[in-house]
Amino acid sequence: MSGAVAGRFLEQLAVGDSAARSFTVGAADIDAFAAVSHDRNPVHLDEACAQTTPFKGRIAHGMLSAAYVSAVLGNDLPGPGSAYVSQSLRFRRPVRIGDTVEVTVTVVAIEPRTAKVTLSTVAKVDGKTVMDGEAAVLAPRAPKDA
């Protein structure tokens, strides 16, 4: 993972704003995700079994890449104080052990009255999209005394 915790208030956001972070997937990350999610599908955990699948080897859980989106939303854009309320996802390609996943979120709409911010979410490996979708968050408002 790269990047320090940042963040912005609703009033500081504009359509087109974006943030990105990179995450390198290790076998330990997949094993830990399997432990916390209870998703122990052998395609993620058993190399011999995974070799018999169309993927021809272990792959990361799709939701691990989705968790990386959550990290960017919660740490950077909008950042701390935001609430993740929805996400659509399309998994385009597998993510493998050793891959570096570059996650970018971009503001596509802002509803000031409700503080709802809609963002496009894209995860890429070597410039190829592995996952994309759209997220909605409630962004924190600036303090009245600021």
Where are these regions (language model features)?
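HotDog/MaoC-like acyl-thioester-processing domains
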Residues: 1-17, 95-146
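Hydrophobic beta-strand-centered segment that forms part of the acyl-chain substrate-binding groove
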Residues: 51-60, 64-104
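Generic structural detector for well-ordered beta-strands
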Residues: 22-24, 90, 136-138
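Catalytic strand-loop segment that frames the active site of acyl-thioester-processing enzymes
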Residues: 2-60
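Short, intrinsically disordered, mixed-charge
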Residues: 35-39, 74-78, 125
